[in-house]
C-alpha cells in the first residue's frame, strides 16, 4: 500500500492561504508554481491557462479581439473566483498587479515576486516573443522597458521578493520554501 508523503511542515503554518506568484512575463511563475505546489501539497492554478480555457482561445487572440482592457477584466474575474478557494499556488499573468482592485484579493494570500532581473527577462522574452501580445511592436525592447519600469514599483508591493537566475524551477521553489517562514507566525506548540 502506498502511503502519501507527510505534508510539508509549512502547510499548517500557511493556514490555507494562497500563494500568488507575480512578476514580469517569462519570470518563471508557471514553471516554479507547479513544483512549489507539489512540495506544499497545495493545488496549482495558472490564471492565463484558466482564461484561455474559459475563452476557448489563446491569450494573443483575446488581446486582438478584446484589447488589453478586456483581457484585464477577464483576468480580474478569474482572480476573484480563485480568491474564493484556498491552499493554492497561483501563477498570475504579468499584468495582474496593474489593477488596484486585484491587490485586495492578492493580499488575502501571500504575494511572491519572482524577479530574474531585466537582462535575463529580456533574453527569455526574445526567445518567446511571438506569444507576448504587449511586445508585438516595432521596438519590442523599448516596449518591454516601458512595461518593466511601470510594473516594477507594483511588484515591489509583494510580501516576498525572490531573486532568480538560471536556477531550475525546483530550485526556485525550494528557495521560496526557505524564505516563507520569515513571513509566517511561529509554529504553535501543542501541550500534551
Curated annotation (Swiss-Prot):
The UniProt note on the cofactor reads as follows:
Binds 1 Mg(2+) ion per subunit.
Binding sites annotated in the UniProt record for Mg(2+): 30
What keywords tag this UniProt record? Amino-acid biosynthesis, Aromatic amino acid biosynthesis, ATP-binding, Cytoplasm, Kinase, Magnesium, Metal-binding, Nucleotide-binding, Transferase
- Its Enzyme Commission number(s) read 2.7.1.71
Could you list the residue ranges that cross the membrane?
none
Reaction(s) catalysed by this chain's protein: shikimate + ATP = 3-phosphoshikimate + ADP + H(+)
Identify which top EC class this enzyme belongs to: transferase
According to its UniProt record, where is this protein located? Cytoplasm
The biological pathway it contributes to is:
Metabolic intermediate biosynthesis; chorismate biosynthesis; chorismate from D-erythrose 4-phosphate and phosphoenolpyruvate: step 5/7
Q: What are the protein's GO molecular function terms?
A: ATP binding; magnesium ion binding; shikimate kinase activity
Which residues participate in substrate binding? Answer: 48, 72, 94, 151
Question: What's one GO-annotated cellular component?
Answer: cytosol
Q: Which residues bind ATP?
A: 26-31, 132
Kindly give the Pfam families that the UniProt entry links to this protein: SKI (PF01202)
InterPro entries for this protein: P-loop_NTPase (IPR027417), Shikimate/glucono_kinase (IPR031322), Shikimate_kinase/TSH1 (IPR000623), Shikimate_kinase_CS (IPR023000)
Which PANTHER family does the protein's record reference?
SHIKIMATE KINASE (PTHR21087), SHIKIMATE KINASE 1, CHLOROPLASTIC (PTHR21087:SF16)
* Subunit annotation: Monomer.
What family is this?
Answer: Belongs to the shikimate kinase family.
Entry function: Catalyzes the specific phosphorylation of the 3-hydroxyl group of shikimic acid using ATP as a cosubstrate.
In Swiss-Prot or TrEMBL terms, this protein is called Shikimate kinase
Q: Which organism does this sequence originate in?
A: Prochlorococcus marinus (strain MIT 9303)
Question: Taxonomy-wise, where does this protein's organism fall, top ranks first?
Answer: Bacteria, Bacillati, Cyanobacteriota, Cyanophyceae, Synechococcales
Amino acid at each position: 500500500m502506498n502511503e502519501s508523503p507527510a505534508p510539508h511542515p509549512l502547510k499548517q503554518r500557511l493556514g490555507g492561504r494562497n500563494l500568488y506568484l507575480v512578476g514580469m512575463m517569462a519570470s518563471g511563475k508557471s514553471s516554479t508554481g507547479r513544483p512549489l505546489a507539489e512540495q506544499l501539497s497545495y493545488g496549482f492554478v495558472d490564471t492565463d491557462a484558466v482564461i484561455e480555457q474559459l475563452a476557448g482561445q489563446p491569450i494573443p487572440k483575446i488581446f486582438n479581439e478584446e484589447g488589453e482592457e478586456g483581457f484585464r477584466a477577464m483576468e480580474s474575474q478569474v482572480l476573484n473566483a480563485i480568491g474564493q478557494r484556498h491552499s493554492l499556488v497561483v501563477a498570475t499573468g504579468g499584468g495582474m498587479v496593474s489593477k488596484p482592485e486585484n491587490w485586495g484579493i492578492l493580499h488575502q494570500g501571500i504575494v511572491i515576486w519572482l524577479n530574474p532581473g531585466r537582462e535575463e527577462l529580456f533574453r527569455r522574452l526574445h526567445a518567446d516573443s511571438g506569444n507576448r501580445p504587449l511586445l508585438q511592436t516595432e521596438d519590442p525592447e523599448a516596449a518591454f522597458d516601458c512595461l518593466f519600469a511601470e510594473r516594477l514599483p507594483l511588484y515591489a508591493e509583494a510580501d516576498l521578493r525572490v531573486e532568480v537566475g538560471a536556477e531550475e524551477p525546483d530550485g526556485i521553489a525550494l528557495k521560496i520554501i526557505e524564505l516563507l517562514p520569515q513571513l509566517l507566525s511561529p509554529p504553535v506548540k501543542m501541550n500534551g
